[in-house]
């Protein structure tokens, strides 16, 4: 049942009291839980997110639309639907490009590790070294990608794919918005750990529980929306060449 909205559009009835639909002061981490139909919008958007590729693109577009709504002063999540696909293409493409580069580098290291491991005991130490390097590279990439998450989302949307692919520009923007970038990274990191822990803990009891838990991913993106609103793409130009 649709939420009851006041005539001026500024208030909605939650069944017990009138709540504001406009931003009033600083938003907390769970700001969206006091907005109309938030649970249904998160759940349906999460279901759409289960669709390979299309779901991920739509979720990114939904997050950027939520950012625009909060920036304009509306304390509300966007309705669920597929209308955010176009908006989500840019950040998805940027992430895909960096992902392909990572796969190529890791693939070369994995192949080198396999070759040295099969060359006899004399090359086993080298193979272990390549394996360790590959692990450290994956760990570093994951941590850096968390730190650059806000920059990728905002820069790809505001500046376009071509400029957002530039790693020096992304790094400059992330450093210029250091507190925001770090907060987004920590929120997403904590959410990832929580999801992984719950998935492992419940997988032995409830089959496919990880899919059910992943339905809450839109809520994680909703948590970082206030930070995306505060992120400034004008804060820094691309770093000069060294």
Descriptions of predicted regions:
Residues 1-25:
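Signature of WW domains and closely related Tyr/Trp-rich beta-sheet microdomains
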Residues 4-7, 75-79:
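Short, low-complexity cationic-aromatic patches
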Residues 7-8, 15-16, 50, 117-120, ...:
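Short, flexible beta-strand-to-coil junctions
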Residues 21-41, 45-71, 78, 82-145:
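Short, small/hydrophobic-residue-rich motifs at membrane-helix boundaries and re-entrant hairpins
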Residues 28-48, 79-104, 146-197, 225, ...:
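Interfacial aromatic "cap" segments that immediately flank transmembrane helices
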Residues 49-71, 124-164, 192, 197-235:
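Selective recognition of hydrophobic, aromatic-rich stretches within alpha-helical transmembrane segments
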Residues 111-118, 178-179, 196-200:
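Alpha-helix boundary/capping detector
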């Amino acid at each position: 049942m649709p939420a009851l909205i006041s005539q001026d559009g500024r208030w909605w009835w939650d069944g017990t009291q009138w709540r504001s639909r406009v931003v009033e002061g600083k938003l907390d981490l769970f700001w969206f839980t006091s907005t109309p139909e938030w649970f249904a919008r998160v759940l349906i958007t999460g279901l759409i997110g289960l669709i390979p590729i299309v779901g991920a693109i739509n979720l990114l577009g939904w997050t950027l639309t939520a950012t625009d709504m909060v920036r304009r002063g509306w304390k509300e999540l966007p309705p669920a639907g597929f209308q955010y696909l176009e908006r989500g293409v840019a950040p998805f493409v940027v992430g895909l490009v960096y992902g392909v580069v990572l796969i190529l580098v890791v693939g070369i290291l994995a192949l080198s590790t396999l070759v040295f491991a099969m060359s006899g005991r004399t090359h086993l130490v080298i193979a272990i070294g390549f394996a360790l390097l590959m692990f450290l590279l994956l760990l570093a990439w994951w941590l850096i990608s968390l730190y650059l998450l806000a920059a990728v989302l905002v820069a790809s949307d505001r500046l376009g794919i071509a400029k957002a692919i530039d790693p020096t520009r992304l790094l400059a923007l992330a450093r210029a918005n250091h507190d925001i970038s770090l907060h987004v990274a920590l929120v997403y990191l904590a959410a990832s750990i929580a999801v992984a822990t719950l998935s492992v803990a419940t997988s032995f009891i409830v089959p496919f529980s990880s899919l059910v838990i992943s339905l809450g991913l839109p809520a994680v993106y909703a948590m970082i929306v206030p930070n995306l609103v505060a992120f400034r793409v004008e804060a820094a130009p691309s770093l000069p060449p060294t």
